[in-house]
Curated annotation (Swiss-Prot):
The protein, known as: Fibroblast growth factor 23
One GO term of the biological process aspect: cellular response to leptin stimulus
Tissue-specific expression: Expressed in the parathyroid.
InterPro entries: Fibroblast_GF_fam (IPR002209), IL1/FGF (IPR008996)
Gene transcribed to yield this protein: Fgf23
The organism of origin for this protein: Rattus norvegicus
């Protein structure tokens, strides 16, 4: 009886811990708690270049040669042949404007963010906007697509399995902790943040030129003022010493 009660108690504790863990990490990654299915990368190529469609955090859409966390997409079917594409890392919907330019948006619009998927004979897929009649394309040339014509470059996509480690989607970016000079003194006991004292220049009145030997008088025979130092110090007194100091003062 006691063993059965202990087993029930351990089971209840495990259930509570698992629920707490799921709640604690529910917002750390867009992949947790999502019903969108597996990750997919839309690959397109020409004879020279190949790219994966990626949606950046600012909504910009471009291509990358290799798979990244921003090229990881989740694709779901809305109705027969209609799909919605969202960036797994940015949570932005792939949308299209009236000129055929694609972008990522947080707000879903059925007219701009829903595409009709067709599979071509070569096995590649194209995504057509029913509203604007343009194909999703990473190329610069935009033209209205008509069935039976060749699609524009970088508009035929092949769905590829995700090869980016899932750890890259969960790891948070490191933050750099900095301090400023306005912090309280107890946060900077060694005065590292405070600026070092600067030496003030010698006043102009204190700088003197050495007399030339060609000049007459006692100054010429005693250019360094060794013999006249005693008399000069007596004349200056305490005030003159403060006013004309040869050494810099630190402020």
């Amino acid at each position: 009886m006691l063993g059965a009660c202990l087993r029930l108690l351990v089971g209840a504790l495990c259930t509570v811990c698992s629920l707490g863990t799921a709640r604690a990490y529910s917002d750390t990654s867009p992949l947790l708690g999502s019903n969108w299915g597996s990750l997919t990368h839309l690959y397109t190529a020409t004879a020279r270049n190949s790219y994966h469609l990626q949606i950046h955090r600012d909504g910009h859409v471009d291509g990358t040669p290799h798979q990244t966390i921003y090229s990881a997409l989740m694709i779901t079917s809305e109705d027969a042949g209609s799909v919605v594409i969202i960036g797994a890392m940015t949570r932005r919907f792939l949308c299209m404007d009236l000129r055929g330019n694609i972008f990522g948006s947080y707000h879903f619009s059925p007219e701009n963010c829903r595409f009709r998927q067709w599979t071509l004979e070569n096995g590649y897929d194209v995504y057509l906007s029913p509203k604007h009649h343009y194909l999703v394309s990473l190329g610069r040339s935009k033209r209205i697509f008509q069935p039976g014509t060749n699609p524009p470059p970088f508009s035929q996509f092949l769905a590829r399995r995700n090869e980016v480690p899932l750890l890259h989607f969960y790891t948070a970016r490191p933050r750099r902790h900095t301090r400023s000079a306005e912090d309280p003194p107890e946060r900077d006991p060694l005065n590292v943040l405070k600026p070092r004292p600067r030496a003030t220049p010698i006043p102009v009145s204190c700088s003197r030129e050495l007399p030339s030997a060609e000049e007459g008088g006692p100054a010429a025979s005693d250019p360094l003022g060794v013999l006249r130092r005693g008399r000069g110090d007596a004349r200056r007194g305490a005030g003159g010493t403060d006013r004309c100091r040869p050494f810099p003062r630190f402020v």
